[in-house]
């Protein structure tokens, strides 16, 4: 996900996406431990997407708090 896509979504949608990304990340960790994970680069993509979403959500909270 790119930052423009993330910022265009509502906070509720971002929370849902965040939950799904975290579940996918946990599944990838299990697959890696079992030796079944073929796409290792997906780890960094998921982690970066999670970080972008959390950054956007925290930015929105700070803006609401200061407004």
Swiss-Prot record:
Coiled coil: none annotated. One of its GO terms (biological process) is translation. GO terms for molecular function: structural constituent of ribosome. Keywords: Ribonucleoprotein, Ribosomal protein. Pfam families: Ribosomal_L29. InterPro entries: Ribosomal_uL29, Ribosomal_uL29_sf. CDD domains: Ribosomal_L29_HIP. Gene3D superfamilies: 1.10.287.310. The keyword Ribosomal protein applies. Belongs to the universal ribosomal protein uL29 family. HAMAP family: Ribosomal_uL29. This is Large ribosomal subunit protein uL29. It comes from Wolbachia sp. subsp. Drosophila simulans (strain wRi).
């Amino acid at each position: 996900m790119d930052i423009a896509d993330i910022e265009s979504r509502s906070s509720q949608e971002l929370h849902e996406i965040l939950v799904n990304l975290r579940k996918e990340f946990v599944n990838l960790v299990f697959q890696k431990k079992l030796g079944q994970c073929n796409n290792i680069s997906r780890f960094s993509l998921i982690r970066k997407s999670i970080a972008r979403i959390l950054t956007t959500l925290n930015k929105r909270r700070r803006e609401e708090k200061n407004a």
